[in-house]
From Swiss-Prot:
Top EC class, one word: oxidoreductase
PROSITE patterns named in the record: FMN_HYDROXY_ACID_DH_2
UniProt organism field: Mycobacterium ulcerans (strain Agy99)
Protein name per its UniProtKB record: Pre-mycofactocin synthase
EC number per UniProt: 1.4.3.26
UniProt keyword Thylakoid present: no
SUPFAM superfamilies listed in its UniProt record: FMN-linked oxidoreductases
Keywords, alphabetical: Flavoprotein, FMN, Oxidoreductase
Cofactors: FMN
Function: Involved in the biosynthesis of the enzyme cofactor mycofactocin (MFT). Catalyzes the oxidative deamination of AHDP (3-amino-5-[(4-hydroxyphenyl)methyl]-4,4-dimethyl-2-pyrrolidin-2-one), forming an alpha-keto amide moiety on the resulting molecule, which is called pre-mycofactocin (PMFT). This reaction occurs via a 5-[(4-hydroxyphenyl)methyl]-3-imino-4,4-dimethylpyrrolidin-2-one intermediate, which converts to PMFT. The alpha-keto amide moiety is the redox-active center for the redox activity of mycofactocin.
Domain of life (superkingdom): Bacteria
Residue ranges occupied by any FMN hydroxy acid dehydrogenase domain in the UniProt entry: 1-383
């Protein structure tokens, strides 16, 4: 329907806020502690300007690239996010949207849909895991991903279980039983469209994480898996090297902000790193990802693929990141708002917005390809870049 279309990611967010129960929407905007980092992720892009060319724009712009061996139509991938139960089709709808727009998807190990179902919707799936449960349990999940056909592995390490969110932590129930439904009903009843979408399926939102269990099993409840994760000692660099060797294929380390950590990741044999602060959901006060990107890209960009996630809201943000050294970006909240606003079509809408913005920025800069972008296309304030580590 025409009135389902939205022009910007900001409008998608507004619609998500209107259509989701309050506690569900809060899970899409939550960030750690004061929210300094999540705010800086977005604001930092506004500090960067462009140095446009007025003559010489090509008739068509090439946005295609590759990430970990996968051809994608533009330098934008779907970032792994947990429990996408804001829509009945969840990760399957997102996978279909990514496939329709020619890009790859990171699938969270805390997803609400099985890896087998998601890969059936889009073969370009990078399976994401946390260091959870020790080597034997992790090896089982890696083998399941391999058997399902995942084309790469993403390991997320930047998590400190921050507490004390100033606006309150998301209220995710342990299970969706009658008691929970009754407790949430005052919120849900004033969001009839959201309620109707799930009502048609005769299934409440799924709060289990099937990819944490064996294939064919329902998997643990979200909070059971979360509790096990909190109780698992964090990995060492030897663990990362072991996991990379166990997988034996394209391997991304997500959550790198420091130059010295980037160098250690290269030594561990990774294929790619993502400069990321977990969308501001990690250690509050960490700089925006885009501030850390130039130093990391300069240090290791000729040895591994460097990506970025955090704060991407428009295509011009993507262009700024690529010009400063990113091969591509991963988006998270932006597509979740699209999913909440209009399901698969809403995610496609978000990807179209980003693609249109990339094309417009390339045209204004006088470039025919994203591969022509350089740092001198960007106006960078003197105190913008943060070099963390050596």
């Amino acid at each position: 329907m025409a009135d389902e279309w939205f022009e910007t990611v900001a409008i998608a967010q507004q619609r998500a806020k209107r259509r989701l129960p309050k506690s569900v929407y809060s899970s899409l905007i939550s960030a750690s502690e004061k929210g300094i980092t999540v705010a800086d992720n977005v604001a930092a892009f506004s500090e960067l300007g462009f140095a446009p060319h007025v003559i010489g724009a090509a008739e068509k712009r090439d946005m295609s690239t590759t990430v970990m061996g996968q051809d994608i139509s533009m330098p934008v991938l779907i970032s792994p996010t947990g429990v996408q139960a804001v829509h009945p089709d969840g990760e399957v709808a997102v996978a279909r949207a990514a496939a329709a727009r020619g890009t790859a998807m990171g699938l969270s190990s805390f997803a609400s849909k099985t890896i087998e179902d998601v890969i059936a919707a889009n073969p370009k799936i990078f399976f994401q895991i946390y260091w959870l449960g020790g080597r034997d349990a992790i090896a089982e999940r890696v083998e399941r991903a391999r058997q399902a056909g995942a084309v790469g592995l993403i390991v997320t390490t930047d998590w400190t279980f921050s507490h004390g969110r100033d606006w309150g932590s998301p209220k995710i129930p342990e299970q969706m039983n009658l008691r929970t439904i009754l407790r949430l009903s005052p919120e849900a009843i004033v969001r009839p469209r959201w309620l109707w979408k799930f009502g048609k399926t005769l299934r409440p939102p799924d709060l289990r994480v099937p990819n944490q269990g064996r294939r064919g099993e329902p998997g643990p409840a979200f909070f059971a898996a979360y509790g096990e994760w909190m109780g698992t000692p964090p990995p060492t660099w030897d663990d990362i090297a072991w996991l990379r060797e166990l997988w034996g294929g394209p391997f991304m380390l997500k959550g790198v902000m420091r130059v010295d950590d980037a160098k250690r990741a290269v030594d561990a044999g990774v294929s790619a790193i993502s400069v990321s602060n977990h969308g501001g959901n990690n250690l509050d006060g960490t700089p925006a990802s885009i501030r850390a990107l130039p130093a990391v890209a300069a240090a290791v960009g000729d040895q591994v693929e460097v990506l970025l996630d955090g704060g991407i809201r428009r295509g011009s943000d993507v262009v700024k990141a690529v010009a400063l050294g990113a091969r591509a970006v991963l988006v998270g909240r932006a597509y979740l708002w699209g999913l909440a606003a209009n399901g698969q079509a809403g995610v496609e809408n978000v990807l179209d917005i980003l693609r249109g913005g990339i094309d417009s920025a390339l045209m204004g800069l006088g470039h025919s390809s994203i591969h022509d972008l350089r740092s001198d296309d960007i106006l960078i304030p003197a105190d913008f870049v943060r070099r963390l580590g050596r």
